Amino acid sequence: MKKYESLDGLRAYAAIGIVMMHVLANIIVKPSSNYLTETIIPYFTNFTLLFMIISAFSVCCGYYERIKNGQIRPNDFYKKRYKRLLPFFGLMVIISVIMDHNYSALCEGFANLTLCFNLLPNPNISIVGVGWFIGTVFTFYMLFPFFTFLLDNKKRGFFVLFISLIFCYIAITYFSTSDFVVKKIDRVNIIYSAPFFICGGLIYLYKDKIYDFVSRNYYLTLTICILLTVVKFIFNKIDLFIIPDLIVFSFWLMYAIGSHDKILNNKFVSYISKISLEIYLCHMMFYRVIEKCHLENIIDNNNLLYISTFLATIIGAIVFSHIIKFIVFPRTIDKLLK
């Protein structure tokens, strides 16, 4: 199976961007107001949508043909999904439950550990708040055999994308009211997120042609991606539904499929990509630790305070993720198997 190494860059930069966004959103003493802090960094919250497209493409690379041709058992597929998501997420849930130690935390923690908590009506779980993404992605995994059916061929895939966009729009504009739901329908809901997963699957169906085109037209594809991103921010205040994000992130994924540039292909992003999910899940825990250190009493410059808080948060998350994923878990598994 061909390895698309530039996807590592997208995962790494998306994870870092989400940390930047969360630190900016939560820090009490804000940095200087400018286009970067008021528009660019807050937009990084949408990198979770990029993660969805990448996740769908990656899972299709590994399992689309095997599920379509009946070459893998459901037991094997879902065991690997649990093995990938549950250990680190479960650890974060247990830590959060211990810290909160109340009945609500226990109930929410139990729901989290099933990974099926997005089957709840309007889940609004505070234990590992960023864990909503795990629930949405695992719902996609549960539906993946059906997803494979929907993308059985390219023609059906585009039809399904069109239908999913209509359903998403109706869900947001009609069903997202107190008559139908308690909580507004957003990316936590699989109907809202479905077009992003479907786009990832459609890109998979065209992956060979995309790879050949991007490889031959590297600068043209990069220019198109940059222009689309710039246009997205120029018309950022115009409500065009989820279409702009869908287009921009899809084009960046297509660029990454055939790209071999050093920005998306280097040792740093390759390493960060391996722990990108873990960084995403644990970074807010480290932000809360840094917050209690009250760096604002030491650093007078607001911009330097934000940068220092971000660096301390991301470094803490990287170190913790590395130790748990590459040292603690392997040794624990080895002992259990002996």
Predicted stretch roles:
Residues 1-174, 181, 263, 275-276, ...:
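Membrane-cytosol interface segments of multi-pass membrane proteins
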Residues 45-48, 129-137, 186-201, 242:
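Membrane-interface micro-motifs in multi-pass membrane enzymes
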Residues 126-132, 210-217:
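Short, amphipathic, aromatic/basic-enriched membrane-interface segments that mark the entry/exit
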Residues 142-144, 200-210:
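Internal transmembrane alpha-helix with an interfacial aromatic "cap," most often the third helix
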Residues 162-166, 215-229:
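Signature aromatic-anchored transmembrane alpha helix within multi-pass, membrane-resident enzymes
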Residues 179-186:
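Alpha-helical transmembrane segments and their interfaces in multipass membrane proteins
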Residues 197, 201, 223-331:
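Alpha-helical transmembrane segments of multi-pass integral membrane proteins
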